[in-house]
Swiss-Prot record:
Its main location: cytoplasm. Residues 309-351, 363-453, 498-650, 663-761, 772-791, 944-963, 1109-1129 are annotated as: Disordered. Residues 690-701, 954-963 have a biased composition (Low complexity). This is STE20-like serine/threonine-protein kinase.
């Protein structure tokens, strides 16, 4: 056995040699150099730890990735190489990299400020424009550096932009980045996070025809800017498939509220978000834009200081009485986005203005008006609807908004925010035992968004006598009037809340003049259920004049409510309500509000709803600015003149009508709402118009603060509890923001709470929630019962000045649900990221395999061509060698034959010459004999003369004879030479013909080979294209399976949540009914005592009848609840099925689109092949013609050559032949005479 076989058996030396990487240290334990001091997070490919160098104490973020093979290790080398090669102040630096025990450690620079999206989540608000400018400029500089170094980031988003404590940013996460080798190189990988993908990247999912370049990062930058301005990226409420379609087909996204932002910002976004790649600006061009001409990073330093500030948390539990009251007064509060509380605190007015310049352009600074849940309440008293239709319209609307917020009832105080102007009005409350006084820190500015209540040094003073409260109310009024006038002088602008998708105005907050002192009252008549006239007084009083009158009104109201509290009654309705509101601009004066969901004005379409807006300039109110209680009364102009008996009769009527109306939708209707006094105060100066337009979807990430009433119930005063109990189901005219959200029924709505990298595959939560309209009351009551108030106080130092910011937030179960949803979406995004990584690896492997196939086939083509040419060249060479040998042999034979023939002829001629010489000798003898016969004396002279004559004649004869022999010899030799030349010509011609035939065969074989190579290359490219599309289909199906799985999980979560909510509602309903029955019975008995005209037996009979009616009503309520639950479950299941169908439809469209692209590409490939073959054949004809012409020319040259040779030798026939020169005929001198 050989040694090599021995090695094969024992696998000696067969292990693949480990590849060494420049920046990765192998077989070194990183924990010997770095100490893990904490965990930072859990990324898509592994955990991220906080590490510290044991020698230098440098901090680093250590990403630990489990890699099972060398191939997986190579996937991360691009990221490591990019990090190692980049040296820029705005790009994180690679500190170290190890590969140890199948774990890849990547240690990068630690940024203590955290990611931008994490900071927004921590502060629960978006960035200001000045902060966005700083982040944008530094990000642009980093991108410009990357693009100059041929690097495409491909995953730019707020989560990959990190803050340092110095106020700078660093770009991170190059896990999916691409490092090109050429400047103009393009990419066609479908990779990145869907919400930030450029349109040209999205198109690469199904078509690789139009690859992208560095400008894809510019689009992602524009999306990231919108994300920083609105907390969420555009279309974040959609599932990724819808997002991809939206990006590809719709117009570029814009800001939700353009009026809030500067023109430079909007123009910068237009330059970034240009769908035409050629028209989109580059990073170098964007760096010249005026939006990024900032030098100081102070806004970011302040932001980081606030985010990293010391936080003190305080949790307050709500009291049971409050919770029960709130169960009757559930208020829709938006909770569909990241919580936001625009805080920006400065130490002086100048600091405030400089720090919040961008905010103050569109959002006024908001004074904190926090209210403690268990200390006081603002009651909203509402008349019970007399008909079911209009009531249900509003109820469904309120319930829809309640549900759409996910029951996330962050009970907070929110003021009306104008564009650069805030009206501050005094808070006066009609509570005998409770008063809440709030002071605003002058050195602080609190800006609050939809789900947060910002509190600055809130002091609550409880249980004061009524006289003290009135006095303090007056003082509070005066102090707040001063503040209001100061701010009114500073900020006089206008802000509109606009729905982004439809452009419809939901509410116009219009600034009003600063003049005070005008008092105006308007009376509106409405018909109640029994046809009696009802009047609502809309009063507009100045902040100074109407204070005493309002105090008198509230005292009257308190007296009347006390008189109605005898017996078991838990509730009594305040009989007098004063309305404070300036006339709105429009056809109807008196501040008439409109109801947007149905496009109906409350005064026109809902006569049973006449909310009383309480005046805040002096009243201790028990009603809200958005609701008006209508009391049955005589035809009078003054509400204060209503008698006590009329009030009680009205209460009784409300009890009866309310009982009938509640059977239809008590659980699903929004309960009566308390509105913070700040709303009332602002409403007196700022008329609110809710335009009656069709509800439409709005941008979910709208950061602009809107009007949201807080829900505050006072459990310490019996009077107010009784007042609230007197209303079985008060109604509420919803504020503009819930109306705004009512339109969010579509996928672009605000129904889901997501993080910045939301990857949820489901449709908008609001699309489901809008289906469950009438299910809110009981679940909201349960949520209210469990809520806690969380106060956060942040203390930090900005430029040497310590700043304290306090925020209050209601903590409910929905908060944990939001966190759970965010976690689930983060998991889904990680799954998507891992899937993309696997796809990228598989694509790279396939590309490598296909490239190898192409190289192999081209190498084989070349080898076959060389082999074929070599074969024919060898044959031609052999033919030429054979021809040469034949010619040489023939020439040798010809020479020998010529020599032999010359010898033979020469021998014969020598014999003939000797004979001729003998003849001449004999003649000479004869002449001599004749001379001897002559006389002797003559003989001598005659002999001499005769000899001379004989010699001359014989010499001439001999010369003539020799010449004749030479001619004969030359003729014979020439004949032989001509024969040989003809023979050679024939052989040469035959050889040339054979050679040309070989050359023809060679060319034909080459042409055939070329054609076969073209066919094989086409088949290979076609098969490779099919393999690529098969891979794409496979990857697309895997993505679709993952999306379907996520959709099913989401649908299951919705069903489980609905089941839980319905279970809670079923459990709560008996308790609510018992409490309600008790209250209604007490009110009924009280009304009997007041109108005691019957005997006790008759009263007892009436009470029995009333109890029977109550039992029947409760049974109807239970039945209605059961039917509603079944309807909700059915609607939800239908919605889930519709969601799945829609998802499958989108998936099928993508698969169909991919198949169409494949068919189109195959068709194009066939057309290209046909064209190439056609062009090759067209080029083949001239090649054949040229070859034949070359062959004819060579034949002609050969013929001319042989012809010229023959002629040249025959030009001088008398000349001695070349051959005869070699074989000379013997002359006379060679023969002896």
């Amino acid at each position: 056995m050989s040694f090599f076989n021995f090695r094969k058996i024992f696998k000696l030396g067969s292990e693949k040699k480990k590849k060494q990487y420049e920046h990765v240290k192998r077989d070194l334990n990183p924990e010997e150099f770095w100490e893990i001091i904490g965990e930072l997070g859990d990324g898509a490919f592994g955990k991220v730890y906080k590490a510290q160098n044991k020698e230098t104490n440098v901090l680093a973020a250590a990403k630990v990735i489990d890699t099972k093979s060398e191939e997986e290790l190579e996937d991360y080398m691009v990221e490591i190489d990019i990090l190692a090669s980049c040296d820029h102040p705005n790009i994180v630096k690679l500190l170290d990299a190890f590969y140890y025990e199948n774990n890849l450690w990547i240690l990068i620079e630690f940024c203590a400020g955290g990611a931008v999206d994490a900071v927004m989540l921590e502060l629960e608000r978006p960035l200001t424009e000045s902060q966005i400018q700083v982040v944008c400029k530094q990000t642009l500089e980093a991108l410009n550096y990357l693009h100059d170094n041929k690097i495409i980031h491909r995953d730019l988003k707020a989560g990959n932009i990190l803050f340092t404590l110095d106020g700078d940013i660093k770009l991170a996460d190059f896990g999916v980045s691409a490092k090109n080798t050429r400047t103009i190189q393009r990419r066609d990988s479908f990779i990145g996070t869907p919400y930030w993908m450029a349109p040209e990247v999205v198109m690469c999912e199904t078509s690789k025809d139009r690859p992208y370049d560095y400008k894809a990062d510019v689009w992602s930058l524009g999306i990231t800017l919108i994300e920083m301005a609105e907390i969420e990226p555009p279309h974040h409420e959609l599932n990724p498939m819808r997002v991809l379609l939206k990006i590809a087909k719709s117009e570029p996204p814009t800001l939700a509220q353009p009026s809030k932002w500067s023109s430079n910002f909007k123009d910068f976004l237009r330059k970034c978000l240009e769908k035409n790649v050629d028209a989109r600006w580059t990073t170098s061009q964007l760096l010249q834009h005026p939006f990024v001409t900032v030098d100081s990073n102070k806004p970011v330093r302040e932001l980081i200081a606030e985010a990293k500030a010391e936080v003190t948390e305080e949790v307050e539990d709500g009291k049971e009485e409050d919770e029960e009251e709130e169960a009757e007064n559930a208020l829709p509060i938006p909770a569909n986005k990241r919580a936001s509380s625009d805080l920006s605190i400065a130490s002086s007015e100048e600091d405030k203005l400089s720090q919040n310049a961008c905010i103050l352009e569109s959002v006024s600074e908001r004074t904190e008006q926090s209210t403690s849940e268990d200390k006081f309440s603002n009651k909203i008293l509402n008349e019970k609807p007399t008909t079911d239709g209009p009531e249900k319209a509003v109820d469904e609307h309120a319930s829809d908004v309640n549900l759409e917020t996910g029951a996330e009832l962050n009970d907070q105080t929110v003021g009306i925010h104008e564009n650069g102007r805030e009206k501050k009005r005094p808070k006066l409350e009609n509570l005998p035992d409770t008063q809440d006084q709030q002071t605003v820190d002058v050195n602080s500015v609190s800006e609050e968004n939809e789900n947060n209540r910002v509190t600055l040094e809130t002091n609550t003073d409880c249980l004061k006598p009524e006289e003290d409260r009135n006095k303090e109310n007056q003082e509070t009024l005066e102090s707040k009037l001063i503040q209001s006038e100061e701010i009114n002088d500073t900020h006089i602008q206008t802000m509109d809340l606009v729905s982004q998708e439809t452009g419809e105005k939901e509410a116009d907050f219009q600034a009003v003049d600063n003049e005070v002192g005008l008092t105006k009252e308007e009376t509106q008549e409405k018909l109640g259920k029994d046809g009696t006239a009802q009047k609502v007084i809309t009063s507009d009083r100045s902040s100074e004049v109407g204070t005493d009158e309002a105090l008198d009104d509230t005292q009257k109201a308190a007296e009347l409510s006390k008189a109605a509290q005898s017996g078991e009654g838990d509730e009594a309705l305040a009989p007098t309500q004063t309305l404070a509101e300036k006339p709105t601009e429009g056809p109807e004066a008196g501040g008439a509000e409109e109801e947007p969901p149905g496009g109906e004005r409350v005064e026109d379409k809902q006569p049973e709803q006449q909310p009383a807006v309480c005046e805040a300039e002096g009243q201790l109110t028990s009603t809200s600015e958005t609701t008006r209680a209508t009391l049955e009364q005589p035809e009078t102009d003054e509400v204060e003149q209503v008698s006590e008996s009329n009030s009680i009769e009205e209460l009784e009527r409300l009890v009866v009508t309310g009982a009938e109306a509640r059977a239809l939708g008590s659980e699903g209707e929004a309960a009566a709402t308390e509105v913070d006094l700040e709303r009332k105060e602002n409403a007196q100066k700022v008329p609110v118009k809710a335009e009656s337009q069709a509800p439409a979807a709005s941008q979910p990430s709208e950061p602009h603060p809107v009007l949201i009433p807080s829900i505050n119930i006072n459990s310490e005063t019996t009077e107010n509890k009784e007042e609230m109990g007197a209303l079985p189901k008060p109604e509420t005219i919803l504020p503009p923001e819930p109306e705004h959200e009512k339109g969010n029924d579509t996928d672009s709505g605000t129904g889901s709470t997501v993080e910045n990298s939301s990857g949820d595959l489901n449709l908008s939560i609001s699309s489901f929630l809008s289906k469950a309209k009438d299910s809110g009351s009981v679940s909201l009551q349960e949520t209210r019962r469990q809520k806690k108030t969380l106060k956060k106080t942040r203390k930090f130092i900005v430029d040497g000045v310590e700043v304290s910011v306090t925020t209050s937030k209601i903590v409910t179960d929905s908060d944990s649900k939001t966190e759970e949803l965010r976690f689930l979406r983060r998991q889904e995004l990680r799954e998507l990221r891992l899937l993309q990584k696997e796809e990228q690896r598989a694509q790279q492997q396939l590309n490598g395999k296909l490239q190898q196939q192409r190289e192999q086939i081209f190498r084989r083509f070349e080898q076959e061509m060389l082999s074929k040419k070599r074969q024919y060249d060898q044959e031609i060479e052999n033919l030429e060698k054979q021809q040469k040998q034949t010619i040489e042999r023939l020439e040798q034979e010809h020479t020998n034959r010529l020599r032999d023939e010359a010898k033979r002829i020469k021998g014969e001629q020598e014999k003939e010459l000797s004979k001729f010489q003998n003849v001449l000798k004999n003649r000479k003898k004869e002449v001599m004999n004749e001379v001897e016969k002559a006389p002797r004396e003559l003989r001598r002279e005659l002999t001499k003369r005769r000899k001379e004559e004989l010699a001359q004649s014989q010499h001439a004869q001999e010369q003539e004879f020799v010449q004749k022999q030479q001619q004969e010899l030359d003729g014979s030799l020439k004949k032989i030479i001509q024969q040989q030349k003809a023979e050679l010509a024939n052989i040469e011609r035959e050889c040339l013909n054979n050679k040309q035939q070989l050359m023809r065969a060679r060319e034909a074989a080459i042409w055939e080979l070329e054609e076969r190579h073209l066919q094989e290359k086409h088949q290979l490219l076609k098969q490779q294209l099919k393999d690529q599309y098969f891979m794409q289909r496979h990857q697309l199906l895997k993505r679709h399976e993952k999306e379907t799985e996520q959709m099913q999980r989401y649908n299951q979560r919705l069903i489980e949540e609905l089941k839980n909510r319905q279970t809670q509602e079923r459990a709560r309903l008996p308790k609510i009914q018992r409490s309600e029955a008790k209250t209604r019975m007490a009110m009924f008995k009280k009304s009997l005592r007041i109108n005691s005209t019957a005997t006790p037996d008759q009263d007892r009979e009436k009470i029995k009848q009333f109890a029977a009616q109550e039992e029947k009503r409760q049974k109807n309520e239970r039945m209605a609840q059961h039917q509603k639950h079944e309807s909700q479950m059915r609607d939800l299941q239908l919605q889930c099925e519709a969601n799945v169908r829609e998802l499958h439809q989108l998936q099928n469209e993508k698969c169909h689109l991919l198949v169409e692209h494949e068919t189109q590409k195959l068709k194009e490939l066939d057309e290209e092949h046909s064209q190439e073959l056609k062009e090759w054949r067209e080029k083949l004809r001239p090649r054949k013609k040229t070859l034949e012409e070359e062959f004819a020319r060579k034949l002609q040259e050969q013929e001319v050559f042989f012809k010229m040779t023959g002629e040249s030798e025959c030009l001088n026939p008398s000349a001695q032949s070349r051959i005869s020169k070699f074989y000379p005929i013997p002359t006379l001198h060679s023969t002896g005479s």
